[in-house]
């Protein structure tokens, strides 16, 4: 399978690291490319933030970062995390030696953060940039601030949790492909089910990101638009099949059509229907 599949644990562990470990194991078992996390502290958002107490309960401490990174290595699945500040970038790159980073939609116009990542291009080789709430011009400006990054992926996203069907707007991916032909385009999904992800692959997405959960009815917005282990497994298998079905852009007969050529491209007798 060529498509990169990012299964985001995010905050869906509720601050229980035994649950987090179990999620990593399931993500690896069902074939994702990455298990993804979020690197921040509640204080990064400020004590007056409406969700401060929630962030305090689910923020992943440094020790657990290293534990999950080690577990990912043992389970043969990539470790990836979203960075939100220059400090969290420094931690991920300098301490954890991460060469790939995720930039969340909320940081699309945080040019100080993007510049700092760009200045670390000797160590940061890949960036996955989500574009929720963004415009084409804002994406273009973000690209300019990440000009040194060797592998920059642009992810279409709608920052609604969960995202209603009428707000998914997958055709925006085509607009992004036309506007930025030099960059691979992907899709970060908050929609119910896996249908939008599969449609995105059919439209040319090279990366699919979706939250991971044990049950979509668990409390919290990231669960409702998430995927269970079974859904992840089904999505990975379906993406692999879609890649085969898409084939190449060449319009020419395939070897399997030889029998049809021999038996159907024959002279027809002009009889009947008089």
Stretches with model-predicted labels:
Residues 1-274:
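Catalytic cores and adjacent flexible loops of soluble metabolic enzymes
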